């Protein structure tokens, strides 16, 4: 280790994936001298699995990252080749944006942003060791023995820690196909008293677009008009749009897969890591859902300038021979050529209950974990954690209060609270169902919830802040106009538009509250003009007005809960001494060491009665 020439930074980020890039950018945007170290600069922002961003719950995270000044939304707006709004016919809480990405364009956008960010330097080299003295991080050591010193280090290792790739009975070490694992760093972390386990994820074989018969498949076009991810985005940012396609497995496919299970590492015991529940391999689906005679496959192009296609829905670790046979049994894939075989990968992750709310490791001061190392799965979940870790590392350097988003403020807050309170016994994926207050945490109001905080932290530009102010001033003015514009009962034209006679005068706001009346219908009423034309503003206004009653109720629930939510629990509490608690609850509180009453209440098995006992104990404890 060459300490004599060691260069110092305030924050070092290890890893250039989705967590690492957001961590490095957020730290640097706050004015902190930051170094991003990646084993390969060419893979910054690489999409290792599916070429897509967003989806249910995930799209909400992307909007929140954007509201906090992150790059993911802007990058996908400039690289997305198909955009769709999922759950468009359902309520606003569960509507979500999803975009198919051109991998090459996406990666280029990320790298360009990193290379042009003030206060941020890049360095290519694998990190093999951490410099830790008296349980305090001091820096890192690269593969060639170079030392870089820093007060804060953020580890975003993805699937690289102890990574092992499986294809049939063959397995070999790797962080992903074509990349070496981080075994030395994994060994270093395992030497500390951190709870470590193994998880598994997988990816499907990539196919040659020229060998597929799309005439046998169902076309899946994108939405019109095109949505955007970034609040600063415009449709003109999007590159050329192209369709995806849909096909299905069949009984022959399933028979071939069943016959190949004898060589499947998942079913022979070679893989011990736990798989993602909501993204199972095709062999897992065939076994678990044996009554089904087909499974849907989304045929997704990987870009505008490549022939590679991603068959979403057939992730597999079966042998190459079995992969080729079952792929060619699928309609439209009869002559398919596999460019890259599918594989499964096992890797180390560390129990996120060993983290503070800031994502700092409790046992090693100054070290932060973000991304799959914490047991999550998905680009969006990783990026959100990276953003949070980067902000909090910078806050610590600047001696500012940490950013601790709450469950009622953001999906980022929901995710982090779930992780540090409940842990992850399987790869954690974000869904809207995980949020108690999801009507407050819509995609359309992510900027309203978070951009003022981003402004306070120094994460956004003046242009972004001014755009935000203009938007919400327009929304406020229009809501006031709707409230104060009255339609008379004698207005026959309004009656025709509304398809009902008015028995007395109504404000436009009152009319908009009705289930079958939307803003577009109201805009046809001559006496109510002028109306807005911006679809984004209209959507926000409709959601605020139509769901005002439900929103008010959720806010009241939050206020009741808030009284005790943030009550601090000292790390020195001896839970074994609180005999009024059951032994099970005492053990769980001792294991998890929750920082607040709110966290304690979300530990599985900790009942409301247990929380009441804790509150009584705290009052007694504080009075001594």
From Swiss-Prot:
Q: Which PANTHER family match?
A: GLUCOSE INHIBITED DIVISION PROTEIN A, PROTEIN MTO1 HOMOLOG, MITOCHONDRIAL
Recorded hits in Gene3D superfamilies, A to Z, give: FAD/NAD(P)-binding domain (3.50.50.60), GidA associated domain, C-terminal subdomain (1.10.150.570), tRNA uridine 5-carboxymethylaminomethyl modification enzyme MnmG/GidA (1.10.10.1800)
Organism of this sequence: Ruthia magnifica subsp. Calyptogena magnifica
Binding sites annotated in the UniProt record for FAD: 15-20, 127, 182, 372
Which PROSITE patterns does this one have? GIDA_1, GIDA_2
One Pfam family here: SAM_GIDA_C
What lineage does the source organism belong to? Bacteria, Pseudomonadati, Pseudomonadota, Gammaproteobacteria, Candidatus Pseudothioglobaceae
Single Gene Ontology MF annotation = flavin adenine dinucleotide binding
Quaternary structure, per UniProt, is: Homodimer. Heterotetramer of two MnmE and two MnmG subunits.
Specify whether 4Fe-4S is a keyword of the entry.
no
Subcellular location field: Cytoplasm
Q: What's in the GO CC field?
A: cytosol
According to its UniProt record, which cofactors does this protein need?
FAD
Per its database record, what is this protein's job?
Answer: NAD-binding protein involved in the addition of a carboxymethylaminomethyl (cmnm) group at the wobble position (U34) of certain tRNAs, forming tRNA-cmnm(5)s(2)U34.
Q: Which family does it belong to?
A: Belongs to the MnmG family.
Q: Which domain of life is it from?
A: Bacteria
Name of the protein described by the UniProt record? tRNA uridine 5-carboxymethylaminomethyl modification enzyme MnmG
Matching HAMAP family, A to Z?
MnmG_GidA (MF_00129)
Entry binding sites for NAD(+) = 275-289
């Amino acid at each position: 280790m060459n300490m004599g020439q060691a260069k110092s930074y305030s924050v070092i980020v290890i890893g250039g994936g989705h967590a690492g890039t957001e961590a490095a950018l957020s730290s640097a945007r706050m004015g902190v001298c930051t170094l991003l170290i990646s084993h390969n600069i060419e893979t910054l922002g690489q999409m290792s699995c599916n070429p897509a961003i967003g989806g249910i719950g995930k799209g909400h995270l992307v909007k929140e990252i954007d509201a906090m000044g992150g790059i993911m939304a802007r990058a996908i707006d400039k690289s997305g080749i198909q955009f769709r709004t999922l759950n468009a016919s359902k309520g606003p809480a569960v509507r979500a944006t999803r975009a198919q990405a051109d991998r090459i364009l996406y990666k280029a956008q990320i790298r360009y942003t990193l290379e042009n960010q003030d206060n941020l330097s890049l360095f290519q080299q694998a990190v093999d060791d951490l410099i830790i003295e008296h349980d305090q991080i001091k820096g890192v050591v690269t593969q060639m023995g170079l030392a870089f010193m820093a007060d804060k280090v953020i580890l975003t290792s993805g699937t690289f820690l102890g990574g092992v790739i499986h294809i049939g009975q063959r397995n070999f070490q790797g962080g992903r196909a074509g990349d070496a694992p981080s075994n030395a760093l994994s060994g270093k972390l395992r030497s500390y008293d951190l709870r470590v386990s193994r998880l598994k994820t997988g990816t499907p074989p990539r196919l040659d677009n020229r060998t597929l018969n799309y005439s046998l498949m169902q076309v899946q076009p994108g939405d019109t008009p095109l949505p955007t991810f970034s609040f600063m985005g415009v449709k003109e940012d999007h590159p050329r749009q192209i369709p995806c396609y849909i096909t299905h497995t069949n009984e022959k496919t399933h028979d071939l897969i069943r016959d190949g299970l004898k060589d499947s590492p998942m079913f022979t015991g070679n893989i011990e890591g736990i798989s993602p529940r909501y993204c199972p391999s095709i062999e897992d689906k065939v076994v678990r859902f044996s009554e089904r005679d087909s499974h849907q496959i989304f045929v997704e192009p990987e870009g505008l300038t490549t022939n590679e296609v991603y068959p979403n829905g057939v992730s597999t670790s079966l042998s190459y021979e079995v992969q080729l046979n079952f792929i060619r049994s699928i309609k439209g894939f009869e002559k398919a050529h596999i460019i890259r075989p599918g594989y499964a990968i096992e890797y180390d992750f560390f129990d996120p209950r060993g983290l503070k709310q800031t994502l700092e490791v409790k046992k090693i001061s100054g070290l932060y974990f973000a991304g799959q190392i914490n047991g999550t799965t998905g680009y969006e979940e990783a990026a959100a954690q990276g953003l949070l870790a980067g902000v909090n590392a910078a806050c610590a350097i600047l001696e500012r209060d940490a950013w601790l988003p709450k469950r009622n403020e953001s999906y980022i807050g929901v995710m982090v609270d779930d992780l540090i309170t409940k842990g992850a016994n399987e790869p954690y994926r974000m869904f809207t169902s995980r949020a108690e207050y999801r009507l407050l945490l819509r995609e359309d109001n992510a900027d309203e919830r978070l951009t003022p905080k981003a402004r306070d932290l120094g994460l956004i530009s003046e242009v972004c802040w001014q755009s935000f102010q203009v938007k919400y001033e327009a929304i406020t003015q229009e809501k006031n106009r709707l409230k104060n514009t009255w339609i008379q009962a004698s207005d026959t034209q309004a009656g025709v538009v509304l398809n009902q006679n008015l028995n007395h005068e109504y404000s436009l706001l009152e009319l908009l509250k009705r289930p079958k009346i939307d803003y577009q219908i109201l805009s046809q009423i001559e006496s109510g003009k002028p109306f807005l034309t911006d679809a984004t503003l209209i959507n926000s206004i409709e959601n605020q007005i139509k769901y005002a009653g439900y929103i008010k109720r959720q806010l009241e629930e939050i206020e009741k809960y808030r009284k005790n939510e943030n009550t601090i629990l000292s790390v020195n509490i001896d839970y074994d001494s609180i005999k009024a608690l059951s032994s099970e609850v005492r053990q769980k509180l001792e294991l998890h060491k929750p920082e607040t009453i709110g966290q304690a209440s979300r530990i599985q098995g900790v009942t409301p009665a247990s929380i009441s006992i804790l509150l009584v104990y705290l009052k007694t404890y504080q009075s001594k």
